[in-house]
Amino acid sequence: MKTLLLTLVVVTIVCLDLGYTRTCLISPSSPPQTCPKGEDICIVKARCDEWCLRRGPLIERGCAATCPEFRSNYRSLLCCTTDNCNH
């Protein structure tokens, strides 16, 4: 009986994905998205182009496997590891 119970527990664990998945914002007005497996970092990139002074920086939010490298056209870059931390 103990063997059967242990087998059922093991099968349940194998069949269910017990891995935690991160949720991040993709825009301020939409609900959070579940990040793909392996992408556990939420990011916010604010970058400038030739129209930056008129309309402001372009904001990109989402999930990433690693924190992107800061580039010269970024105004800011935020990488965080809690759910919906990229607001």
UniProtKB/Swiss-Prot annotation:
Keywords: Acetylcholine receptor inhibiting toxin, Disulfide bond, Ion channel impairing toxin, Neurotoxin, Postsynaptic neurotoxin, Secreted, Signal, Toxin. It comes from the Eukaryota. InterPro entries: Snake_3FTx, Snake_toxin-like_sf, Snake_toxin_con_site, Toxin_cobra-type. Residues 1-21 form the signal peptide. It holds the Pfam family Toxin_cobra-type. GO terms for molecular function: acetylcholine receptor inhibitor activity; ion channel regulator activity; toxin activity. Disulfide bonds join C24-C42, C35-C63, C48-C52, C67-C79, C80-C85. PROSITE patterns: SNAKE_TOXIN. Expressed by the venom gland. It is found in: Secreted. SUPFAM superfamilies: Snake toxin-like. CDD domains: TFP_snake_toxin. GO terms for cellular component: extracellular region. Homo- and heterodimer; non-covalently linked. Belongs to the three-finger toxin family. Long-chain subfamily. Kappa-neurotoxin sub-subfamily. Postsynaptic neurotoxin that binds and inhibits neuronal nicotinic acetylcholine receptors (nAChR) with high affinity (IC(50)<100 nM). Is a selective, and slowly reversible antagonist of alpha-3/CHRNA3-containing and some alpha-4/CHRNA4-containing AChRs. This is Kappa-4-bungarotoxin. It comes from Bungarus multicinctus (Many-banded krait).
